Amino acid sequence: MRYVEGSVTTGPKRISKIGLGTWQFGSREWGYGSGYAATDAADIVRRALELGITLFDTAEVYGTGRSERILGAALANDPDAPRRAYLATKIMPVVPVAPVVEQRAVASAARLGTRHLDLYQVHQPNPLIRDRWTMPGMSALRAVGLVGDVGVSNYSLDRWREADAALGAPVLSNQVQYSLARPRHGAALVDFAAAESRIVIAYSPLAQGLLSGRYDASNRPAGRVRSVNSLFLPENLDRAAPLLDTLREVARAHDATPSQIALAWAIHHPQVVAIPGASSVSQLESNAAAADLYLADDEYDALTAASDRFTPTTGTANLAALARSALRR
């Protein structure tokens, strides 16, 4: 496992380049079945720690708190987890004023069974309540030791800078959708992270499985989450074919899978980490192995060029297409 070097994190823990996203813990929409939360999730967390994964990401809205509870219970099985696990969760900023921020952090910590949140993130920008009303709550949480680092999620670069100013200290991270399917989404953020020793946390780094190479227009994925993702419309799967071909070509050169190469691309930049989910221990192991893959410059450039040529259809026109697709299933 590789770890981030030279970031402005306030604590002693290392942040792994490949982490574990736990949206699927306790969330029925992924279709993993009732036994997943009871047994598989704990096995996945245990194996993640064994493999050197330290970054575990969750949120209060994942399964309406169940993800935090499941993750906390799984980490409690390892007496060394408090020393090694870098625990990150998020507040959904419905009314993100300081007293609410403080209350929600206490509730998240209780569900996670911890007295310290290594990273507490604002899940998305509130368009009406600016960060100057939110960040005093974060400062108070840091002052009492409940929170170590402060992060944001789905923030533009300008809004990230605004959060910095409101906190009066570096906001360590910005968690955004960043992958070969959506590289333009985070390019400016990555440049900022490099200049300021921050971190970009890439969620959905495999584009919900698109970059695994398992799917095409004749073999589309099931499940409610992917059924509303326009990337899986037949026309977009056709458009993704050249990108997937390039992924497979690079994967063959490394005796790796397309998913592993997609993750290696995402974490190629020193200040980017990725938090793929895992439906099984074997998938987790495959994801973790991507941290040890190093892409040559020409491979990285070829993947980036193929990604730039991938232009999925987007916008309101997709709503009708998604509705038609759902009716055909």
Model-identified regions with their sequence ranges:
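Active-site groove signature of glycoside hydrolases
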Residues: 112-128
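Alpha-helix N-cap and loop-to-helix initiation/capping positions
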Residues: 32-40, 66, 70, 96-104, ...
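Short, acidic/polar
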Residues: 34-48, 97-112, 156-161
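Beta/alpha (TIM)-barrel catalytic core signal, keyed to glycine-rich beta->alpha loops juxtaposed to Asp/Glu
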Residues: 2, 125-329
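Acidic (Asp/Glu)-rich catalytic clusters
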Residues: 12-14, 72-83, 106-114, 142, ...
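A structural motif
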Residues: 53, 114-117, 147, 271
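N-terminal binding-site loop/beta-alpha segment at the start of enzyme catalytic domains
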Residues: 1-85
